[in-house]
Amino acid sequence: MTKRERVDGIYEAIQKVNQVYGKWASAHGMTLYEMQIYYRIMERSLQKEQAYITQKELCDELDAPKTSINSIIKRQLKTGYIEMEVNPVNRREKIISLTETGKQYARELVLPLFQSEEEAAAQFTEQEMTEVIRMQEKFADALAKSMEEKVSIVHNLSAS
């Protein structure tokens, strides 16, 4: 297998996972990014007992532009499932949380997804899952390092 074929294999696997999430979102009448709002808030409420996320955190975690996230939030505000308010601790931040109706909606949307993820993960031993995570992180770190070096070279050339 060539280097290119190995890289293509990684991206095809990532794309396949993304398509599964995209189909789930589509089956519920929303985009993947819209679903991610509910996913991230539910994840936080279960793991951190924090039932909200800031707009900045959404942008960072989804690696999406603020304008895109803002448009998605505006659409979801109209559903009545989420609400947005100014963070009392940092008035420059906006907090996105679920309304009571939104909590029920998010449970119906996200909890079966969490269950499917856990069922899929159960197909692997703990050692296999640890290895999958380690290898994915290793590839991401190596890719980031290589790209940073190339960006640095381009910046140095354009500054000359």
Give the role of each language-model region:
Residues G9, Q36-E43, Q104, E131:
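Pre-recognition alpha-helix immediately N-terminal to the DNA-recognition helix
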Residues I10, I14-V17, Y21, Y105, ...:
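Alpha-helical linker/hinge and terminal dimerization helices associated
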Residues K74-R134:
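Charged, amphipathic alpha-helical coiled-coil/dimerization segments
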Residues M1-H28, L32, T79-Y81:
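N-terminal leader segment of winged-helix/HTH proteins
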Residues Q19-P65:
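N-terminal helix-turn-helix DNA-binding core of bacterial DNA-binding proteins
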Residues M1, Q127-S160:
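C-terminal regulatory/oligomerization modules of transcriptional regulators
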